[in-house]
Amino acid sequence: MMNLVPANVTHLDSVVQLEKATFPDDAISKRSFRRFIESNTADFFVMLNDKRVVGYYVVLFRNNTNLARLYALVLSPQFRGKGLGKQLLQHAEDRADLRHSLFLRTEVATSNQIAQQLFINAGFRAVELREAYFPPSTSQSQDALILQKLLPRYELGEDNSVGATERYVPMMTQSTEFTCGPASLLMALDYFGRPTADASQEELEIWREATTIYMTSGHGGCGPHGLARAAFKRGLSVRVAVNTDDALFIDSVRQEQKKEVMQRIQQADIDYLHRHGVTIDVCDYGVAELKADLGAGKLILALISTYHFDGVRAPHWVLICAADDDFIYINDPDYDTLPWESPTERQYLPIPIATFNKAFGFGGRKQKAAVIVGRVD
């Protein structure tokens, strides 16, 4: 019977023997394995057949990051082809998930097709090719394929979660750099049973209705009041939460004429919302409030700064779909994805709550804006 247990010093000789047989030119030393046992930033587990070591893995963690590294995963040749490698890998993923790691990353020699297939079948994606990564070896190529997997996945009905419980909120990618707000609203409309026949055309139509006209450069984005107006016109219940009475994004333009136009267009949206009884709360809307709204069956369009994700200070609308004790789960419509990403990797994207608190808001004055939408009672 196979068991996975934390490694201890009695396992070291067997582990080192298996390591040298697998990587004769680049074996991890016994001293290093001993350090992994003692370290609080490493998980080192062995797979035992009765009391014999037949496999092991090492996952390394770096303080203050959400990235875990699968440093080693080895299975004795005579036990391969029985699903045990998959079992080792799943256990490593579970351990990284317990430490709230967002990503698990590993390196595999380009010549090791079997290992690559194991990881790809488990949901890993190739993110980089590094030439001459491994030392010269007779057993494998020097080039390495860097593989990575997003670990936390939101599951409908999680005990400690709030959010969309009927079905997953569908994903949509914005078609232009300035329509993140409309794309977020279209996802909410679809979830609440009001999909559009031509999403790409409706995306632009919503932008025309909700745009602030100007931004620092290029086309203007969308303000919360304009998005709320568009959502109300399309049959959703709407509430706006902002932390200021001032017009948003004014600081992003310098010309007084542009500032005046932006103020006028936003005031027109505010007046429309007031005439139709839409609530505009001026408050410090935060995680506690958004969890309460998610628990009430709402979805939230939230304005974030992308600085904490890509180093660029830009306003960006996302759709908050769910939350639990550790993460805020968003559908991110951003179309500027990395080459290895697919749209599904931006669906229910887990953002650590501490990171979300930093990102929620835009500009030097940390202007917060949220549009809370739901079905009409």
Give the residues covered by each predicted segment.
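Conserved N-terminal entry element of GNAT/NAT acetyltransferase domains
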Residues: 1-10, 145, 152-157
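Acetyl-CoA-dependent GNAT
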Residues: 6-78, 89-91, 95, 99, ...
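Conserved acetyl-CoA-binding loop-helix of GNAT-fold acetyltransferases
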Residues: 75, 81-94, 113-121
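Conserved GNAT acetyl-CoA-binding A-motif
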Residues: 96-108
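Conserved catalytic-core motifs of GNAT/GCN5-like acyltransferases
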Residues: 107-108, 120, 125-146
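Noncatalytic regulatory segments and standalone regulatory/sensor domains
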Residues: 115, 161, 295, 299, ...
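Active-site-adjacent structural segments surrounding the nucleophilic cysteine of cysteine proteases
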Residues: 150-258, 267, 283-284
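Active-site-adjacent substructure of cysteine-protease-like catalytic cores
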Residues: 250, 255-332
